[in-house]
Amino acid sequence: IYEKEGYCGTCHQENGLGLPDSGFPPLADTNWVNGDHKRLIKLTLKGLMGPIEVKGRNYPGLVPMTPFESLLDDYDAAAVLTFIRNSFGNKSEPVFPWQVNQVRNEIKEKSGFYSPAELLTTHPN
């Protein structure tokens, strides 16, 4: 899933280091990946748009992160998030399909992208 054309690896790269000069942040060793699993699930399902700071570097967020809500079922979302949370030097707890389903139901009425600021307000860690 990670390496499928147009999915995670396209912007964040095979090595998880992203393309900083093009505005795509890394997934390696960042609290956005290793922090609150609910925050990660939300941004994966609904997408992300707006300025974001990752590992001390500011990214303008002009190109939004694709919302995968209609592209990934609960099992595939959990699988790719667990992969990301345990690759590129990351070592975090897995994400389970029931957790994705729970968050999916909680946010089903939300329309549009999340902003980093919005997610940090509800999930600071």
Residue ranges and their predicted role:
Residues 9, 22, 34, 38, ...:
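Secondary-structure transition/capping residues
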Residues 1-21, 33-46:
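Sequence/structural segment immediately N-terminal to covalent heme-attachment motifs in c-type
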Residues 5, 14, 30, 43-47, ...:
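Structured segments of extracytoplasmic/periplasmic soluble domains
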Residues 55, 59-125:
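Flexible coil segments in periplasmic/lumen-exposed cytochrome c-class electron-transfer proteins
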Residues 26-42, 50-54, 63-78:
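Electron-transfer interface patches adjacent to heme c in soluble/periplasmic c-type cytochromes
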Residues 19-25, 61-62:
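Short acidic (Asp/Glu) and glycine-rich catalytic loops that position anionic groups and cofactors
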